[in-house]
Design a protein with these regions (language model features):
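Amphipathic alpha-helical segments that mediate coupling or scaffolding at interfaces
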Residues: 8, 51, 80, 94, ...
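An amphipathic alpha-helix signature
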Residues: 23, 45-49, 135-140, 150, ...
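ATP-dependent NMP and nucleoside kinases share a basic, alpha-helical "lid"
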Residues: 97-104, 111-145
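Residue-level signal for inorganic ion chemistry
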Residues: 12, 31, 91, 110, ...
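Short glycine/proline-enriched coil/turn segments at helix->beta-strand junctions
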Residues: 22-24, 104-109, 169-171
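ATP-dependent small-molecule kinase phosphotransfer cores
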Residues: 35-108
Length: 194
């Protein structure tokens, strides 16, 4: 049985994954995998370059390129993504299937994705745990973590599916409001999943 963990920005899903790791559970991180695959997959490199342009990757003289790793031009990619929703969907259509395949190949039973439902990767798991937190707590966490304004934090939250919608689709919820006992909630869910 495969389990997906999701939650909006600032909910603390990465911290929950850290607590799972302390219990011996390895969680596949979809965001990290996407970044790794964009650096290492020849097919992704070619398709992204065809879509975005030759500026997609930086031309470096480092040995890493010869070792099969390229440096993504984050500024160029961000500019392309923010230019239109269609651009973002086009990049997703290239990257998401590669991540899906990589997860399947990994043999891992747990995965973490901020966009589990939006990306469709929820189809690869049997049950979903959502990590939630009150919006004010999330805003505060994002502002502190990323040193950004309140307005920017609210904007980032607004780009994702509403927390309530994700909650309704999930099988389990972990409330990470700074008050509820996270360890107890995790242990309760793990006991049910045994």
């Amino acid at each position: 049985m495969k389990t997906g963990i999701t939650g909006g920005i600032g909910s603390g899903k990465s911290y929950v994954c850290k607590l799972l790791a302390e219990r011996g559970i390895t969680v596949y991180d979809c965001d990290s995998a996407a970044k790794r695959l964009m650096r290492t997959s020849q097919e992704l490199r070619q398709r992204l370059t065809d879509l975005i342009g030759p500026e997609t990757y930086l031309h470096t003289h480092h040995a890493t390129a010869e070792q099969g790793e390229w440096q993504l031009n984050k500024a160029a990619v961000a500019q392309f993504l923010l230019a239109s929703e269609a651009n973002a969907h086009a990049v997703d259509a290239i990257v998401h299937p590669a991540v899906f395949h990589d997860f399947e190949e990994s043999g891992l039973q747990w995965m973490e994705s901020a966009i589990l439902f939006e990306s469709g990767i929820n189809r690869l798991v049997d049950r979903v745990i959502v990590v939630t937190a009150p919006e004010e707590v999330r805003i505060d966490r994002i502002m502190k973590r990323d040193a950004i304004s309140r307005e920017k934090a609210i904007e980032w939250i607004g780009r994702q599916w509403p927390q309530e919608e994700v909650r309704q689709r999930a099988d389990f919820e972990i409330v990470n409001d700074g008050v509820a006992d996270l360890n107890q909630q995790i242990d309760n869910i793990l006991h049910i999943l045994e």
